[in-house]
């Protein structure tokens, strides 16, 4: 196939998370997928180590999901879920999700189209709940620095990433941020993980007390911070946080958008870290990314109040045209069926040890500060002198260079600043894992050489 060049330069999309100057460059246009690989319009093959955007867990050619979509399209391509009208796939999926999530008993499911919409909905539910209880002042939401919760007005405000706030008048005044629980980056000299967790928990409680517990409605957290760089909770962190939330009658929203459905080696991140949330957001792997769908799981404590209040005022007036879209629900049902049939957590645990150990073997590199991860999620953080306090100059774009070298050798990663995320599909074979580790090593060697050159130029 002849190379297709320049055709899409200056294209018509206002592309997400992309700078304006990039539209003057040829975009990477992906044309097809097969298993753990994607192919661009020139036929070049890439090992997709981020599962698209943390979502294509079953790879790019799971025929059962395609067949589920086709069957539903030929039966009922669309119907809504307003006014007590709905479809069987949405009812079946709601039941299946309630059965699957066992960390804390959930009672109702509300469908959205993305994790962003799910987290946006969570805040509306929390407000509705407190208004119904006669606590209109209890509205503030606490999120964490570096967290990613989505891109809608509310979910972007919850996200603790300053670039997502710039020029958007975010975060809104009802959103508060507490510290990121990244032990390697932020612990004090001599401080153990548990002592670090205690300090962060105490600071969280101080924030609550300073604001007034009667004004704080909920705390939202990813079990493992994904986009921030696969930041694992330090020892006893969630135990301490949950005790404080219970003490002050503050709801816990678990954002399982990245962690849910096996990514960490447990069905949900809440299972791994003994989190007992009041509300849960799921998306991404819910359909293995084959259809846009997300869901909000609501505990009995909250759903009973919402339903009772809706009877008083006439209706629960929140929803989307595509809430519970029958095709998306049919695909999600089939994905969940596959996870159960294939014992997907066992699959992840079988391959994740080699994935984690194979990449962490590069941790001695002079340009790597930390390689961290669990299950099939891992992040590499590039720093100078192996210190979190010694980042490379921004203009060196070390992480971006590493990502470009990976692409050159036929592998796609996510490069954000100087950390690089990987979350491969669960279909990854041992041979493909060997290829992943090999390309990582080649790209790292190139990047080390590049950093040496930049340092010599700086002298």
Curated annotation (Swiss-Prot):
Residues 428-459 form a coiled coil. One of its GO terms (biological process) is alkaloid biosynthetic process. The keyword Transferase applies. Pyridoxal 5'-phosphate binds at residues 115-116, 255, 320-321. Keywords: Aminotransferase, Coiled coil, Pyridoxal phosphate, Transferase. GO terms for molecular function: adenosylmethionine-8-amino-7-oxononanoate transaminase activity; pyridoxal phosphate binding; transaminase activity. Expressed in placental tissue of immature fruit. Its EC number is 2.6.1.119. It catalyses: vanillin + L-alanine = vanillylamine + pyruvate. The modification N6-(pyridoxal phosphate)lysine is found at residue 284. Belongs to the class-III pyridoxal-phosphate-dependent aminotransferase family. Involved in the biosynthesis of capsaicinoids natural products, pungent alkaloids synthesized from phenylpropanoid intermediates in the placental tissue of chili pepper fruit acting as repellant on herbivorous mammals and conferring spiciness to hot peppers. Can transfer an amine from alanine to vanillin, forming vanillylamine and pyruvate. This is Vanillin aminotransferase.
């Amino acid at each position: 196939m002849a190379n297709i060049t320049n055709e899409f330069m200056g294209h018509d999309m206002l592309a997400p998370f992309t700078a304006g100057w990039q539209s003057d460059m040829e975009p990477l246009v992906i044309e097809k997928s097969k298993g753990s690989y994607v192919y661009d319009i020139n036929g070049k093959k890439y090992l997709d180590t981020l599962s698209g955007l943390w979502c294509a867990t079953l790879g790019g050619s799971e025929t059962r999901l395609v067949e589920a979509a086709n069957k539903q399209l030929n039966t009922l391509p669309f119907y809504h879920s307003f006014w007590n009208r709905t479809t069987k796939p949405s009812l079946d999926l709601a039941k299946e999700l309630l059965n699957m999530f066992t960390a804390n008993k959930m009672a109702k499911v509300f469908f959205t189209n993305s994790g962003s919409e799910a987290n946006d909905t969570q805040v509306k539910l929390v407000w509705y709940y407190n208004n119904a209880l006669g606590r209109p002042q209890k509205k503030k939401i606490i999120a964490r620095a570096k967290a990613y919760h989505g891109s809608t007005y509310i979910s972007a405000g919850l996200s603790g990433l300053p670039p997502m706030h710039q020029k958007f008048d975010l975060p809104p005044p009802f959103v508060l941020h507490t510290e990121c629980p990244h032990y390697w980056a932020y612990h004090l000299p001599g401080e153990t993980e548990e002592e670090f967790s205690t300090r962060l928990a105490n600071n969280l409680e101080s924030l609550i007390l300073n604001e007034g517990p009667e004004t704080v409605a909920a705390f939202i957290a990813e079990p493992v911070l994904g986009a921030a760089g696969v930041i694992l909770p330090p020892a006893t962190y969630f135990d301490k946080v949950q005790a404080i939330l219970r003490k002050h009658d503050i709801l816990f929203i678990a954002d399982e958008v990245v962690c849910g459905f096996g990514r960490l080696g447990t069905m949900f991140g809440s299972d791994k870290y003994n989190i007992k949330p009041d509300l849960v957001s799921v998306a991404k792997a819910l359909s293995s990314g084959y259809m846009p769908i997300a869901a909000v799981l609501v505990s009995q404590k909250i759903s009973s109040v919402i339903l009772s209040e809706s009877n008083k005022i006439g209706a629960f007036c929140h929803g989307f045209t595509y809430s519970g879209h029958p095709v998306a629900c049919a695909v999600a049902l089939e994905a969940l069926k596959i996870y159960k049939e294939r014992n997907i957590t066992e699959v992840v645990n079988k391959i994740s040890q080699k994935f984690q150990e194979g990449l962490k073997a590069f941790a001695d590199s002079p340009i790597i500060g930390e390689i961290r991860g669990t299950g099939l999620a891992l992040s590499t953080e590039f720093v100078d002198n192996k210190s979190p306090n010694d980042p490379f100059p921004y203009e060196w774009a070390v992480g971006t260079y590493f990502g470009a070298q990976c692409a050159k050798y036929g592998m796609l990663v996510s490069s954000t600043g100087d950390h690089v995320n990987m979350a491969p599909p669960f279909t990854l074979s041992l041979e493909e894992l060997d290829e992943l580790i090999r390309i990582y090593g080649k790209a790292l060697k190139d990047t080390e050489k590049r950093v040496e050159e930049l340092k010599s130029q700086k002298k």
